Each structure stands twice: as structure tokens, then as C-alpha cells.
Amino acid sequence: MAALDRSMARVEFDPDGNITDANENFLTLLGYRRDEILGKPHRQLCDGAYAQSEDYRRFWERLRRGEHFSGRCKRITREGRPLWLEATYNPVRDGQGRLLKVVKYASDIDAIVHQEHEMQSKLDALSRSMAMIEFDLDGNVLAANDNFLATMGYGRAELASANHRQFCEPGYRDGPQYADLWRRLNRGEYVTGQFRRVHRNGQPVWLEASYNPVYDADGKLYKVVKFASDVSDRMRRYQAEADNAHQAHTLSTETRTVAEHGALIIQSAVEEMLKIANTLDASSLNIGELSQHSQQITSIVNTIREIAEQTNLLALNAAIEAARAGDQGRGFAVVADEVRQLAERTSKSTKEIADMIGRIQTGTRSVIDDMQHSQEQARRGVELANEAGAAILGIRESTHKVVEAVQQFSRTLNADL
């Protein structure tokens, strides 16, 4: 008894519940002096509402019948502060079996109760906001809250003999990842992540969840508690974004291919246009030389025309002189007439040649003008082709950056999925 008095709070009551004795531990715990508490009723140490309740009346009835009580009690200190005690009420009888007194031993568990209450409040808050389910170490369902039942579409009775496996897709639950999950949980590892599960109607459900191993008072692992939130809508958005990213990646890759092909075509076009420009330059030079030659021919024709005119004049003079000579100059006159006719034909042919050369020169000048215009167009075409080629190269470079960005975005989305 002395050892108990040193380690625990003790208070004694008569059969009517009035305090007859209390040790120092009890006085210190409740904040009373001895003279303040002796003779006071037990109800003074209790919450007012409880002291007036039917439960309180039955409590003392059981003690008066000699029934032992052990458990947690909420009592009130001298300052009015609630205090939780782990207590035993022990009825003591005399030799005739009459109730002599009730001895109470108690220890302060106020801090423990408040800690437990805080933990329970947190668990209650989690249970109100999240889906919660408990499993034994073989995956059999022990309990589930209403949020879990609503999320997965089950009734409470349906989970009485259920196992974690039935919430998983066949390909997953029969594979190595599922076996590894439960190996880790049975080793006491905490597992968190996004998990694809199956609704009662067979549709996929995405859960953001944590699997939490739970230990008993002896430190032995005995169950797993899972907290989860339904993130199916978010995952569907992620999947849609991933699909769009994949499509964008495909299109941007095709665009890059087209741009590269276009760059090659334009480069080939530039090379061909450069060849055309060079050919036009050479043709322009040849036509220029031809124009010079036609001008030289014109000069020669003019010289021939002048010679023909002079020959015609000389033939006319010779005919005049032959006429003066009479019969002696008749033969010379015939020759002079032939020379004159030849000079006239030469003059006529020379005129025709001059006209033809004039037309050739006119055509040549027109061709030269057209060639110069074509050269200018060819040069402008080369410049435009080069500009187009530079633009295509820019597009190709930009498309390459787009492809890289889309690839990175796609990888990020796939990692999230």
C-alpha cells in the first residue's frame, strides 16, 4: 500500500460518496489542500452535467453493491480545468459484508488522452474528406468509410469478405508489381502514389493514395490503412493533354520533315535558276556579238552599195563615151551596159540585204531587251529563292525547337501519368 501511495494518487470515500482521505499525490494532482477537500462529495470532482446524470447515479449504485470499476475518468481540478485519470474504484467491506468505504487509485493520463484525441480528430478529418479502407496483411478488407464506398461504388455488406485484389485490374493483380506492393507493405514500408483501380461497374478509377502500415502496442505490424482521393478527372485531363501532345509532336515532326524537304527543293531550284541566269548571261553575250557582227555586215553592205553606185555611174559614163565613138565604141557600149545592169542588180540585192539586216538588227535589239529583262527576272528569282530558302531554314529550325519542346512536354505528361 505504501508503494502505491508513493506512485499513485489515492482518495477514499464513505458509502455516501463523501471524501474521507486523500494522499499528497491526489491533492497535488487536483490542486486542493487537505482541509479543502475532506468531507466534500465525490460529485464536486466531476463535471456538473455528469454529476447530475443517470450514468453518475448508476455508477455509485454499482460501487455500493460492491462492484469494482476500472477505466478512464474525466474529473475537474480546483481551478476548473478538466483532467483525465486512469483510475480504479475499489469497494471495501467489513467483516459482516457491509460496504465500509471505496478506495480510488488514479494516475494522470491527461497528456495521453489529449494526444489521442488530437490524433483521432485528425483521423476523423481525414475520414470525412478522403476515402479510407483498412486491410489485414493478406489484403482482406477490415473496414471502409462511406467515402470509399461512394468512390468505388460498393455497399458496406459487399466488402465483408472482399480482398484488395478485386479493386485491381486482372493484368496488374496477377503481375509482379502487385506482388511487390504487398511485399513492401508486409515489410512495413509506406507506399504512396497514383493508382489505377476498378470501380464496381468495371470502369477505371484513378486514386491518389497512401498505404500506411499500422503497428500494435507490442510493435507488431497487423494491418494497413489506405487513404485515397479520387483524381480520375485530373488523370483524364492529363491523358487528353498527353494525347494532344503526342499529336502535336507527330504534326511538328511531319512539319519539320516537310520543311527539310522544301529546303532541299528550293536549294535545287536556286541552283537551276543560277544555271539559267548563267545561260542567259552567255546568250546575252552571244546575241550582243551577233548584233555587232550584223552591224559590221551592214557596214560592208553599205560599202558594196557605194561601189555598185559608182560602178553604175562609171558604166553610164562609158556608154556615153561609146556613143560618141560611134561604131568603134559599140562593143564597149555593150560591155558598159552589162556592167551597168550588174551594178543595178548588185545595188538591188545590196538594198534587200540591208533591209534584211535591218530587220535582223531590230529583232536582235528586241531579243537583247528581252534577254536583259529575263536576266533581271532570273536574278530576282534567284534572290527570292534564296530568301525562301532562308525562310524555310528558319522554319526548319523553329520546327526543330517546337519538336523538342513538345517531346519534353510529352515526356513530362507521361511521367505524371
UniProtKB/Swiss-Prot annotation:
Domain annotation PAC: ranges: 67-114, 191-241
Domain PAS positions: 1-66, 115-188
Alphabetized Pfam families for the sequence: MCPsignal, PAS_3, PAS_9
Swiss-Prot/TrEMBL GO biological process terms: chemotaxis; signal transduction
GO annotation, cellular component aspect: membrane
Disruption outcome: Cells are named mutant biofilms and do not disperse upon induction of the dispersion by succinate, silver nitrate, mercury chloride or sodium arsenate. They are resistant to hydrogen peroxide and more hydrophobic. They show higher intracellular levels of c-di-GMP (5- to 6-fold higher than in wild-type), increased adherent properties and impaired twitching motility. They display smaller, densely packed and symmetrical microcolonies.
Function: Essential for biofilm dispersion by sensing environmental cues. May be involved in sensing and transducing signals within cells, resulting in the modulation of c-di-GMP levels, swimming motility and adhesiveness of the bacterial cell surface.
Name of this chain's protein: Biofilm dispersion protein BdlA
Species the sequence originates in: Pseudomonas aeruginosa (strain ATCC 15692 / DSM 22644 / CIP 104116 / JCM 14847 / LMG 12228 / 1C / PRS 101 / PAO1)
Organism ancestry: Bacteria, Pseudomonadati, Pseudomonadota, Gammaproteobacteria, Pseudomonadales
